[in-house]
C-alpha cells in the first residue's frame, strides 16, 4: 500500500494514464483504500511484499508476490482458499444467465449447468464476472480492427455480467475503451509480464534498436510497436531478472525464449541479420551506459532502471500487442452500487472489477486491476451484506 503522501500522486498517475476520462471519485476511493487492500490480502495469507514501478507511473505502486509469480493466478489460489475456509459455495461449470428483479430491485439470479437449471433467490447480488476481452463480436462493435486480434483473456471473458445487468436497466461507461498490452506472445496469447520491464528489460525492433520509452503507458508502447517494421518487437532481459521473476522461468520452460551468452549471439538467435546485429550490440551497450548514468537520453525512460542488462545468459521473446483489458463496463458509484441509465442506484445490485467501468478511463495502469478489484470487491461485499441484513 502507498503512504498518505503518495495518494495524490497515485490519483494523478491513474488519471493521466487514463487520459483524464476516468471517474475521479472512483479513482480517489481506489487510491485512498489501496493500502488497506494490500494489508487485507496479507491478513488472509496472500502477501504482496515486492513493489515495482510500472508503465506510466512516477512511483513504485505495483505489488507482487515475493517469488515474482504472476499475481493473477497467485491471488485466485489464495482467494479460493479463503472462500473455502469461510464455507462459500462455488458452483463450477454453471453459467449465470439472468438477474432476477422485484419492484426494480435485484433479488437473485437464474443459472444453468449441463444437467440443471437453477433459480437462486438472494437479498443482494454482486456482479464480478470480469470484462469482455474474449468477446470479439462485442469488441468489434466498438473497434472493428480488433476482430482478428490476439487476446490475453481466458475464454470466459465475454462480458455476460455486463449484458445481464444492461438487460435490467443498468448503464455502462467507456465501453469503447479497450486496452492493447504491448508484450504478448502471439502464438498463444500469453502476456509477458510488465514486471520484466519494471526490473530493467527493454524492447527492440527488427532492426535491433530501441524505439520508445519501454515503460511508457501500455497504449503508448503498443502504438509505437505497431509502427515498427513488421509491427512486432522483442523484449530483452538477462539472468538477473530470470532469477528474481518466477514468471520468466515459466517463459523459458514453455519455449517462448531464445538465449545466448553474449549480445551478438542473442541477436543471431533472434533472427537479426546484417547491420541489425551490430545495432543490437550497440543498443545494449548504450542502454547499460544509460542505466549507469541514471539517464535515458534517447527516450526519457525514468523507471525500471535500477540495474543494467549485463548478467549472462541473455534472453529475448518476440512479442506484439494483444487485447488485454476492457476499461469500460457497468457504471457504479463509490459504494459499488450499479447505476441505471438515469443515474440512480439499482437496489440490491453491486459490481466490482473489470465488469465495471470508470476507474481506468482510456488506459489502465499496470497493477491497478488488482487494486481495483480488491478495493471495490471489498466495498461491494460489505455494502451488499449490509443491504441484505436490512
Regions found by a protein language model. Give the residues of each.
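Short glycine-enriched, charge-decorated loop/helix-capping segments at active-site entrances
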Residues: 64-66, 143-151, 250-254, 363-368
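Conserved N-terminal/central alpha/beta ligand/cofactor-binding core
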Residues: 1-98, 203-215, 229-231, 240-243
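Glycine-rich loop(s) and the adjacent beta-strand/alpha-helix scaffold that form part
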Residues: 113, 120-185, 189, 376-379
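Helical element adjacent to the flavin cofactor pocket in flavoenzyme catalytic cores
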Residues: 67-123, 162-168, 330-331
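A glycine-rich dinucleotide-binding beta-alpha-beta segment and adjacent secondary-structure elements
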Residues: 98, 278-363
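Internal hydrophobic alpha-helix adjacent to the cofactor/substrate pocket in enzyme cavities
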Residues: 161-171, 273, 277, 281-284, ...
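An anion/pyrophosphate-binding glycine-rich loop and adjacent beta-alpha core
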Residues: 162-275
Amino acid at each position: 500500500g502507498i503512504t498518505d503522501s503518495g495518494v495524490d500522486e497515485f490519483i494523478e498517475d491513474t488519471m493521466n494514464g487514463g487520459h483524464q476520462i476516468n471517474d475521479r471519485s472512483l479513482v480517489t476511493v481506489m487510491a485512498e483504500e489501496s493500502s488497506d487492500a494490500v494489508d487485507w490480502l496479507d491478513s488472509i495469507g496472500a502477501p504482496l511484499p515486492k513493489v515495482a514501478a510500472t508503465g506510466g507511473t512516477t512511483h513504485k505502486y505495483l505489488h507482487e508476490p515475493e517469488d515474482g509469480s504472476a499475481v493473477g493466478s497467485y491471488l485466485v489460489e489464495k482467494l479460493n482458499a479463503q472462500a473455502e475456509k469461510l464455507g462459500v459455495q462455488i458452483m463450477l461449470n454453471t453459467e449465470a444467465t439472468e438477474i432476477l428483479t422485484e419492484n426494480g430491485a435485484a433479488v437473485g439470479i437464474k443459472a444453468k449447468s449441463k444437467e440443471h437449471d437453477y433459480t437462486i433467490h438472494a437479498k443482494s447480488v454482486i456482479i464480478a464476472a470480469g470484462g469482455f476481452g474474449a468477446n470479439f463480436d462485442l469488441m468489434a462493435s466498438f473497434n472493428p480492427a480488433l476482430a482478428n486480434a490476439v487476446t490475453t483473456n481466458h475464454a470466459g471473458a465475454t462480458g455476460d455480467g455486463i449484458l445481464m445487468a444492461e438487460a435490467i436497466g443498468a448503464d455502462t461507461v467507456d465501453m469503447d475503451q479497450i486496452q492493447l498490452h504491448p508484450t504478448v506472445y502471439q502464438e498463444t496469447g500469453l502476456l509477458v509480464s510488465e514486471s520484466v520491464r519494471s526490473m530493467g528489460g527493454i524492447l527492440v525492433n527488427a532492426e535491433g534498436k530501441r524505439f520508445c520509452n519501454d515503460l511508457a503507458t501500455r497504449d503508448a508502447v503498443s502504438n509505437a510497436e505497431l509502427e515498427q517494421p513488421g509491427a512486432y518487437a522483442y523484449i530483452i532481459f538477462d539472468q538477473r531478472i530470470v532469477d528474481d521473476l518466477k514468471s520468466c522461468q515459466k517463459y523459458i520452460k514453455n519455449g517462448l525464449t531464445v538465449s545466448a551468452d553474449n549480445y551478438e549471439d542473442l541477436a543471431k538467435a533472434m533472427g537479426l541479420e546484417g547491420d541489425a546485429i551490430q545495432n543490437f550490440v550497440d543498443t545494449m551497450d548504450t542502454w547499460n551506459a544509460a542505466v549507469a548514468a541514471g539517464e535515458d537520453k534517447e527516450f526519457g525512460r525514468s523507471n525500471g532502471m535500477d540495474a543494467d542488462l549485463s548478467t549472462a545468459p541473455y534472453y529475448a521473446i518476440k512479442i506484439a500487442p494483444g487485447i488485454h483489458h476492457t476499461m469500460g463496463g457497468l457504471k457504479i458509484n463509490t459504494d459499488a452500487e450499479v447505476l441505471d441509465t438515469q443515474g440512480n442506484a439499482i437496489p440490491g445490485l453491486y459490481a466490482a472489477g473489470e465488469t465495471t467501468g470508470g476507474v481506468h478511463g482510456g488506459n489502465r495502469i499496470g497493477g491497478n486491476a488488482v487494486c481495483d478489484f480488491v478495493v471495490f470487491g471489498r466495498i461491494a461485499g460489505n455494502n451488499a451484506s449490509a443491504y441484505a441484513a436490512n
